[in-house]
Design a protein with these regions (language model features):
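Solvent-exposed beta-strand/loop surfaces of large extracellular or lumenal domains
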Residues: 30-78, 103-110, 136-158
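Exposed beta-sheet edge/beta-hairpin loop segments within beta-rich domains
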Residues: 79-85
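Cysteine-centered nucleophilic/redox motifs
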Residues: 8, 89-91, 124
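Carboxylate/His-rich catalytic cores and anion/metal-binding grooves
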Residues: 18-52, 184-190, 194-214
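Early extracytoplasmic/domain-onset interaction patches
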Residues: 1-27
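Secretory-pathway-linked proteins and extracytosolic
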Residues: 98-214
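Short solvent-exposed strand-capping/beta-turn motif centered on an Asx-Ser/Thr pair
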Residues: 11-15, 31-32, 129-131
Length: 214
């Protein structure tokens, strides 16, 4: 199985950040093969008051990208509506997406680092069994990860400080290849990864016909 755990702290300094950019968090997952666990979600206001995210602020919807794609209508997007927001408040969110064995053939990570706002501290760790090959790289950056092995587990950790924001324009993006990103994979080779991608495009004609009728 695989677990992706995300922990974030985000302090609001502008009305744009509070009302447009960071008032909600979005988590996409496939409930047929994945489980979402919210460990913590709250807002620490400027005076130190804690406002826990109420149950009705966790809203499950269909991802907008899947709206006109019946084959993907089983996907879910958890919208976490952060409450108690004000200038100077800090949002705390800690969650895991746990994938059952057999759904993902290998670990395959591609995480963009830069956001529209500056990041004081960014940490990403990847842990795999010690005997599992792991290929990794920081794209468009020079930071060197720390590699540790303990208890039969190998962990690779990147820690970046004071990451500058990316420009808000379409020409600057992960697909364009001009932002910092961390990639990591346990595929033995690129050829093995391509085989998995190729299988996704192979389908039974009958299945396609039935899907088209929906």
């Amino acid at each position: 199985s695989q677990e992706m755990r995300v922990q974030k702290e985000l302090t609001l300094f502008t009305h744009t950040a509070m009302n447009r950019l960071y008032g909600e968090s979005f988590i996409v997952y496939n409930p047929e093969f994945q489980e979402l666990k919210i460990h913590e979600s709250y807002t620490r206001q400027k005076d130190g008051n804690i406002v826990k995210t109420p149950e009705n602020a966790f809203v499950e919807v269909l991802p907008s990208a899947a709206a006109d794609a019946p084959a993907y209508n089983g996907l879910k997007e958890m919208v976490v509506v952060h409450t108690g927001l004000e200038l100077g408040a800090t949002i705390y969110l800690d969650y895991s997406v746990i994938t059952r064995p057999g759904y993902l053939p290998e670990l395959d990570v591609c995480e963009q680092i830069e956001e529209l706002s500056p990041i004081r501290e960014y940490v990403l760790s990847v842990s795999v069994p010690e005997n599992k090959p792991l290929h990794y790289e920081l794209l468009n950056g020079k930071a060197v990860p720390v590699v540790k092995t303990a208890g039969g587990v190998k962990t690779v950790t990147w820690a970046l400080k004071n990451v500058q924001p990316r420009p808000s324009m379409l020409a600057v993006s992960l697909p364009a290849g001009n932002v910092q990103a961390i990639v990591a994979s346990t595929y033995a080779s690129k050829a093995d990864a391509l085989k998995v991608i190729k299988r996704q495009f192979e389908s039974n004609d009958k299945e396609v016909s039935e899907l088209a009728k929906r």
